Every structure is written in C-alpha cells, then in structure tokens.
Amino acid sequence: MAASGKLSTSRLPPLPTIREIIKLFRLQAAKQLSQNFLLDLRLTDKIVRKAGNLTNAYVYEVGPGPGGITRSILNADVTELLVVEKDTRFIPGLQMLSDAAPGKLRIVHGDVLTFKVEKAFSESLKRPWEDDPPNVHIIGNLPFSVSTPLIIKWLENISCRDGPFVYGRTQMTLTFQKEVAERLAANTGSKQRSRLSVMAQYLCNVRHIFTIPGQAFVPKPEVDVGVVHFTPLVQPKIEQPFKLVEKVVQNVFQFRRKYCHRGLGEELKRRKNKNEEKEEDDAENYRL
C-alpha cells in the first residue's frame, strides 16, 4: 500500500497559474483526444500525496498536458520527473516548468502507448520482484480514450515483468472515468465486478482512493473522475499466461451475470476440441 507522502518545502519559484499558461499559449482541450485539464492545484497535490512519499523518487508522468500534476510532482522534491506528451502544443508550457526546475524535468514528445520507459531510468533503480516496490512511480491524468487500453497493456507488462516493471513492482496512480475506476476496484460479488476487475486484481492490489467531480476539469466532462492506485502483487492470484487469463475472462463476462458460466463453458469446450484435434494430428503423424 502507498504511504501518505508530504509535499516538500522545496517548491518551484513563482510561475504563471495553469489557467494563465492555457491563455498564454492559447491552449484548448482537443475533444478527439478526450482531453480535460485539471486546474485546481489542491487536487493535483492530493493526487501526488496519494501516490506515496515521492521524496528523491523517479516519476514517469503520462499525459501531462498543461502541467498541473507536473507542478505538484516537482513540488514533492523528486529526483527526476520524466513526462511523455503526444500533443506538441503543451511542450512550451512544460519547458517553462523545466526551466524553473533545472535538471529535474525531462520532456519527451511521444506516445505513451509505444514509449519504452524500461530504458528511461538508471539500471541501479531495479529491485528484485519480491522486495518492496522500487523508488519509481507512474502518475497520470489519462485521457479517457487511452485509459483502458493503456492499463491493459501495463497489466500485461506486470505479468511479464517488463516495460515499466523491469524496475520491480512499480506503483501507479492514475485517473479514469469514475465508472471504470469503480470496476477496477470492485470486490467479488459487487454489481460493478467486470473483466477489468479480474484482470487488474489478479495482478495488483487495486484501490479507488478518491473521486474528483467533473466540474473540477476544463472542459467539464460528462462524468466524474476516479483516482486509482495500483501496487503489483509479489505473486499473481492466477498462475497462467496473461493472454490465456484475458481470453477466459472475456468469455466469462460476455454474457449477462446469471449466464456467465456459458462463456466459461464455451471457452473450455473450444480448448478441449483444440486439444483433441492436436492429439489426432499427432497420432496421424506418428502413423506416417
């Protein structure tokens, strides 16, 4: 579980507010990219506190946008903050933050879905999987359009211990639509229990730590936003390959709850038929 960290007294020098940055660089949220800006630094500070104690930490922030959470992370006295931003419009504002925190903020123009974060930090930060989590964190206010595919990608990385998890059990603090956040953290028997619940919880300790009202964002989304914290488990709850677990779970949840056994039955039947066909082929090859 994440410790409750305190923001450092070593803070950034006076800077324009995020709202002023948006006006200065004439930034507008791109609807096609599901962008929503979080301008209230009290909320961005809260997200950072819930990530744990970031003093001297190495942080990978995804989708920094105009830099609200970025400021809060830098104010937490991290050793290094790496931000990956796809939208070039935000780079000048982020560069202003970099100039205010010399040597601490590294800006990469790229796509979080393809960026190789396993090569971003020093090898010396790596810790054995069985140890406590490394001093590496992932934090992000994710655009709704990429949040689900990105967390599925990272869950697969956890199962393989690659990507951001080459450093060990890297913790993540991320935003999702409230409904998605509730599904990720839903307990067994909950009406919110879903494919995402199983996929996340068989690999991680998942906590929906708080909810941010939609009106806190600009532009205001139609839904509230949930902040979710993930800590990879030392031992997964299901000892099977990720793709197999994913396929079985997809089949289970493709039917309504009371009929979900049908999905599991169909997947088991399919796998049985496949095994029988393989056995027949092997027998035929042996006779030849």
Model regions and ranges:
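Catalytic cores of RNA-modifying enzymes
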Residues: 1-251
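An accessory alpha-helical subdomain
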Residues: 223-226, 230-234, 238-287
